[in-house]
């Protein structure tokens, strides 16, 4: 017999369904559920008196080879491909299905490969939001404590370079040379996150670059502090093309070896990832932003300029002087710093993100950026732009399109750009189960739980001496997946194809699983999902005013931001 339930009661029990809307944190961003994979009346739910019991939603005949290891029930999923509600099935550390889990012997509509059995444990996703683990592709490995900070904010993959607090690492994301690379690969072996190292790409001779690829780097960083000349760019891209790795570029702020046009000429038709294209983080002054126009250049922004506020400009001067080893008592050093900081390009950056012209947001960790703010800054920018411009033309009664555009900036697009999208970057069957769970009220600020390779590695947790898990203080803590040898199965070290094929990990004693980057050279900005626009950019060299497709861009700085004081004491 059919039983009708009030919508508000249904939401309390099973979470929202099709047509229901959710506010993200305290922003003005509203999502709407596009599809619900469940069969009404056949929802799976764990607990006393609920239906995930033997012979009901749990198939008593399903052995380990056919049952899920873990199921997340009735969770809202936000991903580039949709905003939906359903169950997430995990097996052998990978997502095997997004749909309807349960017992097909007694339930209708159970998705193949999503059988709940005696081998299955349950994470209740009712009322929660699931997203793919974030990917930060601009990490200065200055201190190991960054990794835990990033993890607790929902970042499960770090790509960048460095060897600790050296002058080079504090300024550039380079792990230079085989000896340093091997030491860093060993150093990160026990961290419960995915990591890929970038080598130093600044060489006008190919052999030192080839040595670094063979030592395992997933790409190169070309940085002006090491000399970002046209010859260096050309040489590095030749090696990258030969070995199928990516190149990240921080261009020549002082225009010593050429202007932005010379850099574009040196790049040719080859693909690369252009860091902090607004320019405050470094790059041809005042017009590095022009690289956004080209389909073979994948542009990104870093957290310190996102979004543009009344405080952004003023905090940059001291930050820049320290990070690039300048002397505030030397006039020429101060002038160099000032030349890189322009409010007009900072304002235009927000606009270009909102129209999908800048593809990625990453941190620039401890080198003018904050690793724990990648996700928060992304959604603050989206919220700021909605407050100013209203809904996007593609949105009607919700903000689904804008939300898909912005979540792609730190999930699927960096994965595509760096050759790891076949493994991670979205919640899709066949990919590693790197999943972050959020309460809607805390979305983008403080996760509830972080699943890495199908196993819980971090979660909010109360007093360990309490009778239940919830008594205060409730803080994010590492869970069992972050300890012991479990890390070797749940986390991955990304390496070059050469390193992987020659099993160099075994020769140097790496225990963690290694996977090769692929398809770094046959992509373009056109592959950046929801973020592949190629607007015409012009910059007035006297006033630094920015024109996009002929229109002057004048986005006001934010006076206050959401997702801030309501959530944090400091």
Curated annotation (Swiss-Prot):
Post-translational modification: Carboxylation allows a single lysine to coordinate two nickel ions.
A GO term for molecular function: nickel cation binding
UniProt key word Protease: no
Binding site for Ni(2+) 1: 138, 140, 221, 364
InterPro entries, sorted: Amidohydro-rel (IPR006680), Metal-dep_hydrolase_composite (IPR011059), Metal_Hydrolase (IPR032466), Urease_alpha_N_dom (IPR011612), Urease_alpha_subunit (IPR050112), Urease_asu (IPR005848), Urease_asu_c (IPR017951), Urease_Ni-bd (IPR029754)
This protein's record includes keyword Hydrolase: yes
GO CC aspect terms: cytoplasm
Sites bearing N6-carboxylysine, chain numbering: 221
EC number per UniProt: 3.5.1.5
Positions contributing to substrate binding: 223
Cofactor note: Binds 2 nickel ions per subunit.
Record note on quaternary structure: Heterotrimer of UreA (gamma), UreB (beta) and UreC (alpha) subunits. Three heterotrimers associate to form the active enzyme.
Family: Belongs to the metallo-dependent hydrolases superfamily. Urease alpha subunit family.
Protein name in the entry: Urease subunit alpha
Gene label: ureC
């Amino acid at each position: 017999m059919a039983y009708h339930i009030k919508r508000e009661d249904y939401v309390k029990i099973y979470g929202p369904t099709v047509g229901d809307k959710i506010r993200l944190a305290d922003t003005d961003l509203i999502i709407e559920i596009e599809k619900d994979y469940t069969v009404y009346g056949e929802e799976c739910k764990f607990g006393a008196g609920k239906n995930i019991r033997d012979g009901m939603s749990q198939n008593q005949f399903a052995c380990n080879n056919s049952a899920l290891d873990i199921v997340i029930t009735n969770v809202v999923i936000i991903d580039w491909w949709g905003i939906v509600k359903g169950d997430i099935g995990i097996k052998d550390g990978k997502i095997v299905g997004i749909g309807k889990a349960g017992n097909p012997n007694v339930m209708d509509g159970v998705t193949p490969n999503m059988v709940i059995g005696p081998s299955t444990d349950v994470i209740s996703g009712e009322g929660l939001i699931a997203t793919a683990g974030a990917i930060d592709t601009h990490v200065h490995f200055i201190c190991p404590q960054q990794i835990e900070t990033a993890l607790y904010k929902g970042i499960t993959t770090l790509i960048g370079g460095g060897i600790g607090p050296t002058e080079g690492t504090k300024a550039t994301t380079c792990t230079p040379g085989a000896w340093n690379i091997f030491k860093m690969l060993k150093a990160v072996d026990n961290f419960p996150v995915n990591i890929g190292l970038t080598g130093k790409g600044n060489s006008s001779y190919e052999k030192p670059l080839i040595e670094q690829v063979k030592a395992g780097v997933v790409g190169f960083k070309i940085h002006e502090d090491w000399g970002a000349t046209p010859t260096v760019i050309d040489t590095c891209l030749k090696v990258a093309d030969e070995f199928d790795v990516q190149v990240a570029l921080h261009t020549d702020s002082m225009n010593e070896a050429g202007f932005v046009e010379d850099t574009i000429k040196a790049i040719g038709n080859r693909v690369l990832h252009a860091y902090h294209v607004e320019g405050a983080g470094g790059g041809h002054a005042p017009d590095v932003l022009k690289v956004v126009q080209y389909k073979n250049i994948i542009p990104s922004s870093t957290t310190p300029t996102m979004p543009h506020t009344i405080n952004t400009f003023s905090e940059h001067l001291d930050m820049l002087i320290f990070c690039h080893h300048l002397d505030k008592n030397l006039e020429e050093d101060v002038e160099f710093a000032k030349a890189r900081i322009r409010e007009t390009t900072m304002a235009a950056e927000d606009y270009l993100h909102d129209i999908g012209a800048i593809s990625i947001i990453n941190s620039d960790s401890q080198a003018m950026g904050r690793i724990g703010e990648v996700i928060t800054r992304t959604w603050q920018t989206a919220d700021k732009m909605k407050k100013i411009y209203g809904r996007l033309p593609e949105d009607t009664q919700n903000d689904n399109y804008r939300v898909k555009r912005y979540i792609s900036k730190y999930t699927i697009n960096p994965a595509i750009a760096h050759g790891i999208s076949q493994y991670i970057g979205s919640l899709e069957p066949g990919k590693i189960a790197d999943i972050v769970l959020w309460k809607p009220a805390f979305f983008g600020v403080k996760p509830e739980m972080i699943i890495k390779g199908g196993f819980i590695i971090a979660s909010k947790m109360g007093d360990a001496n309490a009778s239940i898990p919830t008594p205060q203080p409730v803080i994010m803590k590492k869970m069992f997946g972050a300890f012991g040898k479990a890390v070797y199965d749940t986390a991955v070290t990304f390496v070059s194809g050469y390193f992987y094929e020659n099993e160099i990990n075994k020769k140097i004693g790496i225990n963690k699983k290694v996977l090769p980057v692929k398809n770094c050279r046959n992509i373009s900005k056109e592959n950046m999902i929801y973020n592949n626009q190629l607007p015409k950019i012009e910059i007035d060299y006297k006033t630094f005013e920015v024109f996009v497709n002929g229109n002057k861009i004048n986005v006001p700085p934010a006076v206050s931001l959401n997702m801030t004081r309501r959530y944090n004491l400091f």
